[in-house]
Amino acid sequence: MQKRTLGNSARELATIGLGCMGLSEFYGPPTEQAAAIKLLHEAIELGVDHFDTAEMYGMRSANESLLGEAFADRRDRVFIATKFGPTRDWETGMATGIDGSRENCRRAVEGSLQRLGTDVIDLYYLHRVDPATPIEDTVTAMAELVAEGKVRYIGLSEASGDTIRRAARIHPISAVQSEYSIFARDIEADVIPACLEVGASLVAYSPLGRGMLSGRFKNETLGENDWRSANPRFQGEAYAANVALVDEIEAVAAAKSCTPAQVALAWVIGRGEHVLTIPGTTKMENLKSNLGAYEVLLSAGEQTTLDALADRVMGDRYDESGMAIING
């Protein structure tokens, strides 16, 4: 199990963690509780120690509650990251805005601590930057939580390079979470240089392009309640073109006797020691297969082939409303 240091901390984590959102929402019906807990326990046994959740994942923060139950007797073996900022109407599930105020930060952390069944959150992110609250004010509030022992490290998610630098002047930023994959490389010009400058790890979410890079969408359609159906990269002409691009990833995988998903993950973790990643899955076989990416070493020629794909991807990585709240 490959380990890397979390940003400017002394904490070492498995390079490949587990994004837990899909266990509770967004990719179809929630996974049955017992099955979800079994998968989380198996992940620990396989050497995964970094688990990512958020207040907004699952109705009434069900994903945090799931992790709290799963890790109740295993807390010393796991590193839990959660996030605050986006707000939802829990009667309808609809998003209602972003609140990075001190008041919301303190309200949210107390709820997360309770649901997670812990007295300290290992890594606490601002999930999206609140345009109405100066980042300095939000990070000051988050730093108070560190001083009070409620949070160990703080991070930002989908923040711009300028915001990262401003935040780091207030308190060390240990991690920046952004979408990063063979198909999503827009952060390389601004966000990654800022991470390196302030000593933050890049935590890459959706390293498999929301499943597209696994190659399985050639034979599957999106299920009911799958939010990807509203994602521009999964619609119409763009969907067909993007799925066709995966052929080139599959060719690399065939030559290396591995899976396309393993190639995609190897590409991400091969970008540097500052990169951690949190692929999500609801299936035990995918969990085990993803960890096989540690054994995949890409040649310079393979890297060049894969690097060229991003410029040919069609569609934004979120719909218009989603694009409006990234790179804040």
Model regions and ranges:
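Short, well-ordered coil/turn segments that N-cap beta-strands
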Residues: 11-16, 47-49, 75-78, 118-122, ...
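N-terminal small/glycine-rich loop or linker at the start of catalytic domains
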Residues: 9-27, 81-96, 120, 125
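N-terminal binding-site loop/beta-alpha segment at the start of enzyme catalytic domains
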Residues: 1-78, 315, 327
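Glycine/proline-rich, positively charged
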Residues: 91-186, 190, 201
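Aromatic-lined glycan-binding groove of carbohydrate-active enzymes
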Residues: 187-223, 259
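Conserved, mostly hydrophobic/aromatic
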Residues: 6, 18, 36, 51, ...
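Terminal-tail/helix-coil boundary detector
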Residues: 1, 197, 224-251, 255, ...
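Active-site beta-loop-alpha junctions enriched in small/polar residues
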Residues: 21-23, 54-56, 83-87, 126-129, ...
